[in-house]
Each structure stands twice: as C-alpha cells, then as structure tokens.
C-alpha cells in the first residue's frame, strides 16, 4: 500500500512540473518581456538618444569650409572620400526603432505617448543628419534582424521620400512632447524643439532643392515658414537682450539663456568632468574664419559688404565697421575684451587668415585646458534662428511676409 501511495505522489509531482513552463526570463537582462513596463523604463531607455546630438570635441567644426586651422581639413584639402567617412552607422536607429516597437508594453498611456515622441524626434534628427551627409538613404522604421536580408540589401530611398518622413516624425513628436522641458535648463526635447528642428530641416531641404534645380522646393519652404510662425506665435520664447553684447553673452554663458535657447547641453567640469574643448582649440590650433565667411555679414543698413567699393583691399579695422553687430560678437575685432578681463585683447594674428573666433570663448583659464563649460556650446536651436527661418523661407517661397513679433 505504501508503494502505491509513493507512486501516486510521484505521478502527481511529475504532472505538476510537466504542466508548468520552466523557462524563466533572466532577471539581470533587459528583454522586451521584462522591460518597458513603466515611465521610468521608458525614460531610461530614451536617455541614450541624446548622445545623437552634436558631440562637443576638439574639431569644433573645423571640417567645414568656412574655417581653417593649422591642421587643415579634408574638405579644404580636397581629400575627403567615401572610404574616409565614418558616418555610415545605424546602431542608434536600431535602438530607436526597438523602443517604438516595444513601448506598447507600458500601460501608462501618457508616458508612452511622451516618450514615443522623444523617439520620433531623434529618429527624425538621425535621418536629417544622414540626408545632409549622403542625400538618398534607405528608410527603416522597424527593427531588422539577420534574416531580413532583402531589407538589409534594399536600394536607397529617394531624398524626398525620406525628408517627408523626417518632417512627419517631427510633426508627430510635436503633438506628443510636453511644452516645457522636464528640467529647468532646457536640456530635454519639447514640442518647441520638434517644431524648431522641423523648420530647420524644411528650410534646408527647400533651399537645397531651389538652388539645385529640383522640384517641389516650394512645399518645403512653406512648411518651414508655417512651422516657424507657429513657434514664434505660440512658444513664448524670445530673443535674449540683456547687456551690451547679448549675442556673445548667450554663447559663452555657463548656464543657457533659457528665454531664447530651446535646447541646450549643460556642462559641469568640477562635479561631473563634463566639458568641451572649443576654447582650447581656438587658442591652440590657430583657428580662423575665412575671408568668404567674413564677407557674408551685411552692413548695418542691410546692403552687402561686397557691394562696397574697395572691399577686397580694405584694412581689417575698416572692414568690420558698420557691419551686422553679430560680427563683432563672433570674431575678434578692435576693442574686444575677453570675459573676466578689464583690458582690450589685441589681435595677435596667430589665427589663420587673421580672423580669430570669440564665440563660445569664456574666461582665460579655459584657453590652456579642455575644460570649457559654456552651456550654449550646443545651442541646438534658439528663437533667433526661428525668426530667421520664418523670414528666409517666406521670402524664398514668395509668401506674404508679416512682421514677426520683436519679442
């Protein structure tokens, strides 16, 4: 009888365990099944997207063709090639699409909508960078695996196809994101950041098409104008006007001027060892603007500097007179006094071409070390640019141009 009882008990235990799923998800690994469950999960995952924004580094934009330093650059030297490029990376897009594919696990609809907006903003930003760099690129809005060979090998989508989806992502992000940054320093994307970047992207595409003889440029210029106007009318941002040199002050302040700066990066060298090396690079790489860059600045009466008789041979101290005030707050000009100093800093002509940048330049202590903390080093978008976007896109598209508020 005891033997029978043991057999029955053993059978019951066997049946019990055979009816259970013994596959346990690892508790220390992030999987779709155990993550994206709440607002905190969504926020933590989307935090990584902010690394997509322009990284501060020692190059400080020297690869552009309006600036030169002692190291030159591939663009200026004419040595840039497909083989030397390093921007054909798609891993961050995968992280974004992975999030959008699994964020539905979160039951908090408000949080889900907000962070989906963050992901859509950064997908649009990711692709805008790619279009500017490569033109036609393949559009992916899903996570690809090794078995998706056909999609992985597909041809590039047209520039217009991708740009339309970029603008749609920015539009969707604007409807989902909050109107105020979740911190007081405007380091988080908002509805206004989405509208600002949408306007920037549309203006870029519209002018690119107009000056390259491509169709549909009017469509993008109209989007740029209407989006910028909405920002101007509704955002509450205004031009920073304090002090005698507000433009210069805005770009060398340790704390972003949040009345104007829509999206900024904040640095903290002492506590977090977060800094940038722009000022160090300007001082030690002999960075200088080109003459062509200088010629872009208009006269104070709105006429072109290059229409001025004898502009080609004009002496340095004369060519900077009566120009757009932003010139003297961007380039070292006579009577320049560095932040924290009381005496004039003379132009020692160590900068190539002689036109030394002062934008982002703070106190002298940052000249000798890569410890700059000016928050608006990454002034990713500001109200001044949106006002310019509105007027430029409206004029190019020949839209009736009301005067935007002066803020």
Task: Name each region found by the language model.
Residues 3-10:
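Sec-dependent signal peptide recognition
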Residues 16-19:
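C-terminal motif of bacterial Sec signal peptides marking the signal peptidase cleavage site
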Residues 21-72, 141, 170-172, 188-353:
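An aromatic- and glycine-enriched ligand-binding surface/loop that stacks and positions planar moieties
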Residues 37-47, 51-55, 70-135, 150-164, ...:
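Conserved, well-structured interaction surfaces
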Residues 136-145:
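Short, flexible, mixed-charge acidic loops at enzyme active sites
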Residues 147-154, 212-216:
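Short helix/strand-bridging catalytic loops that position acidic/His residues to coordinate divalent metals
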Residues 337-379:
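Surface-exposed, extracytoplasmic segments of Gram-negative outer-membrane nutrient-acquisition systems
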